[in-house]
Design a protein with these regions (language model features):
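Structural motif
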Residues: 126-128
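Residue-level recognition of conserved beta-strand edge/terminus positions
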Residues: 132-133, 164, 335, 350, ...
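Polar, glycine-rich mid-to-C-terminal structural blocks
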Residues: 293, 305, 312, 316-383
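Cleft-lining beta-strand/loop regions that shape enzyme active-site pockets
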Residues: 21-34, 38, 42, 46, ...
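Hydrophobic membrane-insertion alpha-helices, especially the h-region
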Residues: 2-18
């Protein structure tokens, strides 16, 4: 990045106009502030410093520090990382279409994208990739970053992979033509029971709304009469996608969200009345990992009394960023406004400019204070507001659910925590899958596979594997954590063999938050009732 570009970012020298992404249609001009101290400093360093200095590196260090002094969500994204960030929200990227893991310094194909380039070329789950374009690719050089660099590439370009198949020694070679690989933001859509549809939204990207319409159409074919939208651990994305999604469920002219900032006049987003599911009973699931666009959707449903929010208090991100790209491919995301739910609340949790440590540890603090386990431990840090029918809601720290569901810690032991945190469960699940792939591939649905895995006593097999790999067997703890261990182990095996939807359906079995939603529908209580007036 040339010196003048660095100065543009740091001190605001005029370099042109950058267009915001989906957060706003307005243009943001970076103008000369009149202060040239940093500009002069960098010129002096470049001209006079005793040793040669990489000015670009200085700038890459300085920009994040400057933005960190504004708020926790104004960030700098290097040119190296910008494409991956864009791909995640765009909904697709160009590559070969495999999901892989690295075991013993070798790429192992974990899953192959259905109808993707790799599958069309003949790559199978379980294959080991040992060379790329005729050059060996094993050993210490194999990292996630390097593997992604070699496998991704422009659409219609070719890459030749050398593969060793399970049970064979001879290397097979496959030439793959790279293509567009979808990154779906909706990872599951199926029926929980004969009346209730379920949709899991992983993130809010460019394709979320059309994906939602497809999912709803599929559920309509099964005559669903109520709907669960699962936003747990959905960290957000494009505001417009959340607005479009909320519009499907709201009657005409209902405020969905509004945004306002020092240089951004208030902008309202309202429903147009064309949504196809305005009277459908609805429950929305959230937790501490639900942020940003997830909170916009949940807030719109809650403040308009359109459905029931179930789970735990959401993250609390109420700031709107505008994305500004630079010619070298890097970009910044600058906070330009706050967003407000229909009742007028900003759900941004408190922060101190320049101090990200406390902000980033907020979720841990909530856990330690008992908020994950008791609704009484929730501390509302903002003022009270009221929904359309007069229910009390709070700003200043996320969306508090209408129905609280504590985290289930039954069976939690130090053995389970070590097994989960060490990565041993993931390693065992992949090894088990690899060793039993022919048999596992014969199962056509999640339920039959899960029943088979229970019969195989995968927990006992894992305990033996873990003991050989540094995690001492603790029989009493293993018995106490048996249900948790079985769920984690078998879910990963199911994921390795099937897909996101099968994995999601499995982990949702006996999920207390899902069960609470089904209970709400059974009692016909999805639409909130007006609070009684105390006399």
């Amino acid at each position: 990045m040339p010196l003048i570009m660095a100065l543009c970012v740091i001190v605001g020298i005029l370099i042109g106009t950058f267009y915001a992404n989906h957060f706003s249609g307005n243009r943001l001009n970076i103008i000369n502030s009149g202060s040239n101290r940093l500009s002069n400093l960098l010129h002096i360093i470049n001209d006079q410093y005793v040793d040669k200095v990489d000015i670009d590196s200085l700038v890459d260090v300085a920009i994040p520090q400057i933005l960190a002094d504004l708020d926790p969500h104004s960030v700098y994204i290097s040119a190296k990382d910008a494409q991956a960030v864009a791909d995640d929200l765009k909904g697709s990227f160009s590559g070969v279409g495999i999901e892989f893991t690295i075991r013993q310094d070798t790429i192992r194909v974990q899953n192959v994208v259905k109808n993707g380039p790799a599958q069309r070329a003949g790559i199978l789950a379980g294959d080991k990739i040992v060379s790329v374009d005729g050059k060996p690719f094993v050993g210490k050089i194999v990292t996630n970053e390097e593997a992604m660099r070699r496998l991704k590439g422009p659409k219609d370009t070719k890459v030749k992979l050398g593969v060793v198949r399970y049970g064979q020694k001879k290397v097979k070679y496959f030439t793959i033509t790279r293509g567009d690989i979808p990154q779906k933001s909706i990872t599951a859509a199926y029926m929980l029971d004969k009346n209730t549809g379920y949709i899991k939204v992983r993130s809010f990207g460019e394709t979320t709304y059309p994906e939602m319409l497809i999912a709803l159409a599929q559920l309509s074919q099964e005559n669903f009469k109520s709907l669960v939208i699962d936003l747990r651990d959905n960290t957000g994305g494009y505001m417009n996608s959340a607005v479009q999604m909320a519009n499907e469920f709201l009657p005409k002219n209902k405020l969905i969200v509004y945004m306002e900032g020092r240089k951004s006049p208030r902008q309202d987003f309202r429903s147009d009345g064309h949504g196809s599911y305005q009277k459908l009973p609805l429950c929305v699931l959230i937790n501490e990992g639900s942020a940003s666009a997830s909170e916009i959707f949940a807030g719109a449903i809650q403040d308009n009394d359109r459905g029931t929010i179930i789970g735990r208090r959401s993250f609390g991100k109420g700031l709107v960023q505008q994305q500004l790209g630079f010619p070298d491919g890097s970009m910044i995301r600058l906070t330009i406004a706050r967003y407000y739910t229909p009742s007028g609340r900003c759900i941004q949790k408190p922060f101190t400019a320049g101090d990200t440590k406390d902000y980033e540890s907020d979720i841990v603090t909530r856990y330690e204070h008992g908020e994950f386990f008791s609704q009484d431990s929730i501390k509302h840090q903002g003022p009270a507001y009221h929904t359309g029918i007069g229910r009390t809601v709070y700003g200043g720290g996320g969306i508090t659910p209408d129905i609280f569901v504590p985290e289930d810690t039954l069976g939690m032991t130090s053995y389970y925590k070590q097994a989960a945190m060490s990565g041993l469960i993931l390693q065992f699940a992949f090894t088990y899958t690899d060793n039993n792939r022919p048999k596992l591939n014969t199962f056509v649905n999640m339920m039959s596979l899960s029943k088979y895995l229970v019969q195989q006593n995968t927990v006992e097999q894992f305990a033996t594997y873990a003991d050989k790999n540094g995690l001492k067997r603790r029989n009493l703890m293993i018995r106490k954590s048996h249900k948790l261990l079985e769920k984690f182990i078998n879910s990963r095996i199911i994921y390795n063999i099937m897909d996101d939807q099968a994995w999601t359906a499995y982990i949702n079995l006996d999920d207390p938050t899902i069960e609470k939603a089904l209970e709400v529908f059974k009692k016909n209580e999805a639409f909130p009732k007006k609070p009684s007036i105390k006399k």
